């Protein structure tokens, strides 16, 4: 497998597409591309068809997906404020593109357009439009019906309203639904960094009703939180005031869950009179949860730890990666440009990297697929997998 990335920031959409495709093609050193990922910044929304046409004139891969996004990633750079086109090419990688649509019916709704293979343990890349496809249903389907199926991707961030989204699939530009790629044989390794760290202790949920949690270990959640805060430093108390999150343990068989074992959800509200809290997830009695905090320093540490752990466990050589990082990260979170991209390149030795800023990140935690926020989710492609 060989992977190449090309990028061009010239304002002319067609010229940028031609130059980016040419750069990526040259990096394949004569090998034929088997998969292309085409990404454009929001400035090129109205010329998405021209971008795709220009790329296909330069290369004609058997599989192509992509989108127009709020900001895009190329190499060690995150291009947030200028027009750009990025082309990511891979050779020697089996790939099959597909699209999905969400159709409402008199009795409910249907997901149409593609059937996941129940017998295969394949990796799927998914790029859903947030306005026409409920991403939570998209993620829950493989969890419930297809255990072992891993999905990675990002909710497309390029549109400000319904109809603004631009998705690429092979020779077509779409404005709704989901585009995706099936990668047989798990040639990609999912890597997910949620940017949080736990505080206090894990508690068993002893009282819950939907998204409302009334008891943690037999006491109101706010009482548990006050007990934790009393033992924190002033700086940590400030984080609780501005960046408090809830972590739900995914694998209840873990004796001592730690960083990376939780799916992180937001705190929606609290009732001081009862001590209960509401979170952005339905929670069952018996689940284990722990309060979490998120800040730039913690997110940097978590990303480094997650990538280093993944690199140490790779079953082969890292050939390249696709990154789906939250549009709330970047300069907004870290105060500097290029944080996630440059950190990944530093830790993985400058591998070919591309991606985009997403409005929700998709990736597995402890073997269960989830939709995240403020997260960096990555598909790390591995050559010579055992």
Curated annotation (Swiss-Prot):
Indicate whether 4Fe-4S appears among the record's keywords.
Answer: no
Location within or outside the cell: Cell membrane
- Grouped into one coarse class, the protein's main location is membrane
Q: Identify the keywords attached in UniProt to this record, alphabetized.
A: Cell membrane, Membrane, Transmembrane, Transmembrane helix
Cross-referenced InterPro entries? FIST_C, FIST_domain_N, UCP018953
Which GO terms of the cellular component aspect does the record hold? plasma membrane
Tell me which domain of life the UniProt entry assigns to the organism this sequence originates from. Answer: Bacteria
Query: What's the protein's topology in the membrane?
Result: Multi-pass membrane protein
Tell me its family.
Answer: To M.tuberculosis Rv0628c.
Q: What is this protein called?
A: Uncharacterized protein Mb0898c
Q: Which organism is it from?
A: Mycobacterium bovis (strain ATCC BAA-935 / AF2122/97)
Top-level taxonomy: Bacteria, Bacillati, Actinomycetota, Actinomycetes, Mycobacteriales
